[in-house]
Amino acid sequence: MFKVGDLVVLKSGGPVMVVISTSLISAECQFYSEKRDEYDSIVIIHEALEEFK
């Protein structure tokens, strides 16, 4: 399970995100959207994420 402050990415690829909150099944992650030139957040199930190395 991930904790607040962890850096993660989708297993399928994508931007580096920081975990800003967690639950038993998911993590809310914040990332910078270059397309919109602003920060955004998304809730993703833990199984779809991996630690950024």
Language-model regions: role of each:
Residues 7, 11-53:
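Basic/aromatic-rich interaction segments and small domains that mediate binding to polyanionic partners
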